[in-house]
Amino acid sequence: MKDPSRSSTSPSIINEDVIINGHSHEDDNPFAEYMWMENEEEFNRQIEEELWEEEFIERCFQEMLEEEEEHEWFIPARDLPQTMDQIQDQFNDLVISDGSSLEDLVVKSNLNPNAKEFVPGVKY
């Protein structure tokens, strides 16, 4: 449907609507459409910095994973063969309590000393 105000066959030109070379007459700066480029270097620097940061974080995670795998695969206590001296030291570290602490344990015990010995699978 046509607009009745524009019923004439020739287009009406109003001074405010005239645009020359993509700019209206009111536009004082002929380079306004290129103003987005003003901060292009700062934008590029910021993006580059973010990319470097992401790469650094990725490398850190990769190194952490590699270290974790190295430690996971090699556990000295498990993977190295023990020498006789180490085994002897472990046996010497085992403490067999002396009789005095055993007597204290018996005095404080609630067990019946006259009870039958427990044998698995035998019903009394």
Curated annotation (Swiss-Prot):
Any one Gene Ontology cellular component term annotated for this protein: cytoplasm
Region described as PABPC1-interacting motif-1 (PAM1): spans on this chain: 22-75
Family annotation (InterPro entries): PAIP2-like, PAM2_motif
Sequence segments annotated as region (PABPC1-interacting motif-2 (PAM2)): 105-120
One Pfam family in the UniProt entry: PAM2
Post-translational events: Ubiquitinated, leading to its degradation by the proteasome.
BP term (GO), one: regulation of long-term synaptic potentiation
Gene Ontology MF annotations: mRNA binding; mRNA regulatory element binding translation repressor activity; translation repressor activity
Localization, UniProt: Cytoplasm
Keywords per UniProt: Cytoplasm, Translation regulation, Ubl conjugation
Subunit relationships: Interacts with the second and third RRM domains and C-terminus regions of PABPC1 in a 2:1 stoichiometry.
Domain notes: Only the PABPC1-interacting motif-1 (PAM1) interferes with the binding of PABPC1 to poly(A) RNA and translation initiation.
Protein's job: Acts as a repressor in the regulation of translation initiation of poly(A)-containing mRNAs. Its inhibitory activity on translation is mediated via its action on PABPC1. Displaces the interaction of PABPC1 with poly(A) RNA and competes with PAIP1 for binding to PABPC1. Its association with PABPC1 results in disruption of the cytoplasmic poly(A) RNP structure organization.
Family (UniProt): Belongs to the PAIP2 family.
PANTHER family: POLYADENYLATE-BINDING PROTEIN-INTERACTING PROTEIN 2
This protein's name: Polyadenylate-binding protein-interacting protein 2
Biological source species: Bos taurus
Gene giving rise to this polypeptide: PAIP2
